[in-house]
């Protein structure tokens, strides 16, 4: 019996006059902001390559399509070995689906702990994307204090690009290296992350891997931005306001933002009497991070 995806793959094959042996069903193009992010990052990577190992941050709202755009960047740059490290392993399905279903990445191979394909059995002549959690790939064996045996291969490869996904989950630990010792992501997420300084951010010089480029992805990297971890030339921003503006100003048919809901932002002005009470204190002690903080797991 044929599935919906089988039919889509057949339609794609007929329309594009290809065998489509990998049954790919997606052929959409990048939206303007995705292309802009790729263009800006490529330009920075190429210009800064001589200075060391360039890094770049995509500060982009949820549903921007960071996964798809990151793959397009890798393809544009001609990268063949890409390592994706995430602080939330549950996003593996999005990374795998985008690579395995879009026509632009035909021939690319995806490897994770849940795939039958391994790095040793993969076709080394074709691009390879390896996905894993930061805790697993860069963690150490608690017994020996050395790299986990099953992950030694990750450290023997000089990667073309290392991508840190969901960076906001790992960017502001009091001691960032402690993440290596956490086997349970929930143990990490529930820790107190109120304290942050630039010194606490990830320093590529002590990562036990080798690579030529770093790409950081996050929808809310506020503390990393406030700390000065990235300079202006290393950041691409795309906010909800940018998206709404693009939706409103789109010219022509097939508006790619048409299906996105209208966003209404409301503010509240604190009464003067409350402001006076607050100003009587020695310090302004109100903190949004504390106001919205939560205790416990789940």
Regions found by a protein language model. Name each.
Residues 67-103, 136:
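Conserved Walker A/P-loop ATP-binding site and its immediately adjacent core
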Residues 1-59, 68-80, 97:
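ATP-dependent helicase/translocase motor core
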Residues 50-53, 123-126, 143-160, 206:
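Short basic/glycine-enriched coil/helix segment immediately N-terminal to the Walker B
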Residues 103-145:
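Inter-Walker segment of RecA-like/P-loop motor cores
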Residues 134-136, 152-215, 220-221:
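SF2 helicase catalytic motif II
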Residues 213, 224-298:
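Interdomain helical connector at the RecA1-RecA2 junction of SF1/SF2 helicase-like NTPases
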Residues 89-91, 135-139, 168-169, 219-224, ...:
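Conserved nucleotide-binding/hydrolysis micro-motifs of P-loop NTPases
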Residues 63:
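Walker A (P-loop) phosphate-binding loop of P-loop NTPases
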């Amino acid at each position: 019996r044929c599935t919906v995806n089988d039919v889509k793959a057949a339609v794609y094959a007929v329309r594009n006059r290809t065998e489509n042996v990998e049954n790919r069903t997606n052929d959409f193009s990048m939206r303007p902001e995705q292309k802009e992010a790729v263009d800006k990052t490529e330009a920075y990577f190429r210009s800064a390559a001589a200075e060391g190992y360039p890094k770049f941050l995509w500060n982009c709202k949820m549903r921007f399509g960071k996964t798809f755009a990151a793959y397009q960047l890798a393809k544009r740059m001609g990268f063949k070995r890409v390592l994706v490290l995430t602080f939330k392993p549950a996003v593996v399905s999005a990374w795998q689906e985008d690579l395995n279903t879009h026509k632009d990445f035909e021939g690319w191979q995806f490897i994770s702990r849940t795939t039958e394909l391994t790095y040793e059995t993969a076709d080394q002549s074709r691009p390879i994307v390896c996905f894993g959690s930061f805790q697993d790939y860069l963690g150490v064996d608690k017994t020996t204090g050395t790299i986990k045996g099953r992950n030694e291969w990750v450290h023997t490869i000089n990667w073309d690009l290392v991508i840190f996904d969901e960076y906001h989950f790992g960017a502001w630990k009091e001691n960032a290296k402690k993440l290596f010792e956490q086997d349970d992501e929930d143990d990490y997420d529930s820790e107190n992350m109120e304290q942050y300084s630039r010194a606490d951010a990830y320093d590529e010089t002590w990562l036990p891997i080798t690579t030529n480029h770093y790409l950081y992805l996050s929808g809310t990297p506020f503390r990393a931005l406030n700390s000065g971890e990235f300079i202006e030339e290393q950041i691409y921003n795309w906010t909800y306001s940018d998206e709404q503006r693009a939706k409103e100003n789109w010219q022509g048919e097939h508006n790619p933002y048409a299906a996105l809901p209208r966003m209404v932002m409301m503010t509240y002005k604190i009464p003067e009497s409350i402001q006076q009470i607050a100003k009587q204190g020695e310090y302004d002690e109100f903190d949004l991070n504390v106001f919205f903080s939560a205790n416990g797991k789940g």
